[in-house]
């Protein structure tokens, strides 16, 4: 009986190790930590808000927000939220995006264009962090509108979510890539 229990515990530990290994593939980058307060009749209650970008540098990225009484717990909550909001994006062979795309969230507008190999990530602030964590190495991005860090990160994710590959477009239009028909615009 006790040997069976030991084997079960060993297998649970092995599963936990495998989970930890799969979690280690993800990169977490902190964008911002803010001290926020809630005013109650007893006074001001201070807490912390963390904004984190989570990704595997291979086409998956998500933005998470967490609030807690201390910085460590806020960061943990933001990481968990980022993992819940992961999206998969297509990346070209030159580690760029397949086509121009615009991402909008609130008053933020992000314009992203593919760039030649070796040009690097030309973007600022939280958009740069989102693109790097997603695994995009060659892209040009411009922020328009609001300078809000969280909304800019979410606008970048929204734009990346709108990316499509050639095969997806052909499938949507009921065409085949090796068809001899001309596509009229």
From Swiss-Prot:
Main location: plastid
InterPro entries: Ribosomal_Su5_D2-typ_SF (IPR020568), Ribosomal_uS5 (IPR000851), Ribosomal_uS5_bac-type (IPR005712), Ribosomal_uS5_C (IPR005324), Ribosomal_uS5_N (IPR013810), Ribosomal_uS5_N_CS (IPR018192), Ribsml_uS5_D2-typ_fold_subgr (IPR014721)
Localization (cell): Plastid, Chloroplast
GO biological process, one term: translation
SUPFAM superfamilies found in the cross-reference section: dsRNA-binding domain-like, Ribosomal protein S5 domain 2-like
Signal peptide (residue range): none
Cellular component GO terms, alphabetical: chloroplast; small ribosomal subunit
Keywords (A to Z) from UniProt: Chloroplast, Plastid, Ribonucleoprotein, Ribosomal protein, RNA-binding, rRNA-binding
Pfam families hit by this protein: Ribosomal_S5, Ribosomal_S5_C
GO molecular-function terms, A-Z: rRNA binding; structural constituent of ribosome
Subunit field text: Part of the 30S ribosomal subunit. Contacts protein S4.
Domain notes: The N-terminal domain interacts with the head of the 30S subunit; the C-terminal domain interacts with the body and contacts protein S4. The interaction surface between S4 and S5 is involved in control of translational fidelity.
Function recorded in the entry: With S4 and S12 plays an important role in translational accuracy.
Protein name: Small ribosomal subunit protein uS5c
Organism (species): Trieres chinensis
